[in-house]
From Swiss-Prot:
GO molecular function, one term: tryptophan synthase activity
Key words, A-Z: Amino-acid biosynthesis, Aromatic amino acid biosynthesis, Lyase, Tryptophan biosynthesis
Reaction(s) catalysed (UniProt annotation): (1S,2R)-1-C-(indol-3-yl)glycerol 3-phosphate + L-serine = D-glyceraldehyde 3-phosphate + L-tryptophan + H2O
Subunit structure: Tetramer of two alpha and two beta chains.
Native organism: Actinobacillus pleuropneumoniae serotype 3 (strain JL03)
Functional note: The alpha subunit is responsible for the aldol cleavage of indoleglycerol phosphate to indole and glyceraldehyde 3-phosphate.
Name the UniProt record assigns to this protein: Tryptophan synthase alpha chain
PROSITE patterns in UniProt: TRP_SYNTHASE_ALPHA
InterPro entries: Aldolase_TIM, RibuloseP-bd_barrel, Trp_synthase_alpha_AS, Trp_synthase_suA
E.C. no: 4.2.1.20
UniProt key word Lyase: yes
Top-rank EC class of the record's enzyme: lyase
């Protein structure tokens, strides 16, 4: 079983959901970013969803765009991100690691090289945000060749045919988008049909469902689980903690530890 498969099996046995934080690697710099990831794991993160800094992130709101800019302004590249992942994997051999990034990064220099580096450094799954499931075959084949699980987004307007295709192609976990738009901790509304989407995904035997977009409070984690999700992803709320504590790493890590601990506690019934 993959690390994600093992994680969800273990959580199910404990009647817990997954809490998965998202951060942009190398924000605000390499060493501080690694300490941030150590803090996430130490305080209950079940898995990691990691972004590579990119100049034109499509799905990201202003908070994560700023994180990308900080990392890029520091001179950090894809090479530094893979170096960081290798360091994470060395210290945490069991933690599932998923990447969330744009297709442009996968093609540099080639898909094959990218997924090979993922495998070599310890990545488990990759979600390419700007590749719709209808155009996925090329990427899933390249990922599978190197033992990397492909993850796809289920949008709130997905029809039954799309849901069935997502369920067939997605491995590791299914990323259920709470609402249309870009990432943001401010916009915490979710689509009214999420319960129907979740039911349809489960009927189609999808990979475990993680709800993302606008997850910033423990109540929202509980709500996601009550709807039938297997866990929740929180990104913008975490990156905002980083943003407002750039002048104090001690304060940043302290605030982050409290947030993650509270969010993880919300996954336990």
């Amino acid at each position: 079983m993959s690390r994600f498969d093992t994680l969800f099996a273990n959580l199910k046995a404990k009647n817990e959901g997954a809490f998965v934080p998202f951060v942009t690697l190398c924000d605000p710099d390499f060493d501080r970013s690694f300490e941030i990831i150590e803090t996430l794991i130490a305080n209950g993160a079940d898995a990691l969803e990691l972004g590579f800094p990119f100049s034109d992130p499509l799905l990201d709101g202003s908070v994560i765009q700023a994180a990308n800019k900080r990392a890029l302004d520091g001179g950090y590249s894809t090479d530094a991100c893979f170096e960081m992942i290798a360091k994470i994997r060395s210290k945490y051999p069991e933690i599932p690691i998923g990447l969330l990034l744009c297709a442009n990064l996968v093609f540099v220099p080639t898909q094959d090289v990218f997924f090979k580096r993922c495998a070599e450094t310890g990545v488990d799954a990759v979600l390419i945000a700007d590749v719709p499931v209808l155009a996925a075959e090329e990427f899933t084949q390249a990922a599978k060749k190197h033992g990397i699980q492909s993850v796809f987004i289920c949008p709130p307007n997905a029809d039954q045919a799309t849901i069935e295709r997502i369920a067939r192609l997605t491995e590791g976990y299914t990323y259920l988008v709470s609402r249309a738009g870009v990432t943001s901790a401010e916009n915490q509304a979710h689509a009214k049909n999420l319960d129907n989407l979740i039911e349809s995904l489960k009927r189609s035997n999808s990979a475990p469902i993680l709800q993302g977009f606008g997850i910033a409070k423990p109540e929202q984690v509980k709500e996601a689980l009550a709807l039938g999700c297997d866990g929740a992803i929180s990104g913008s709320a975490i990156v905002k903690i980083i943003e407002r504590n750039l002048d104090s790493q001690t304060q940043l890590l302290s605030e982050l530890a409290k947030f993650v601990s509270v969010m993880k506690t919300a996954t336990k019934s």
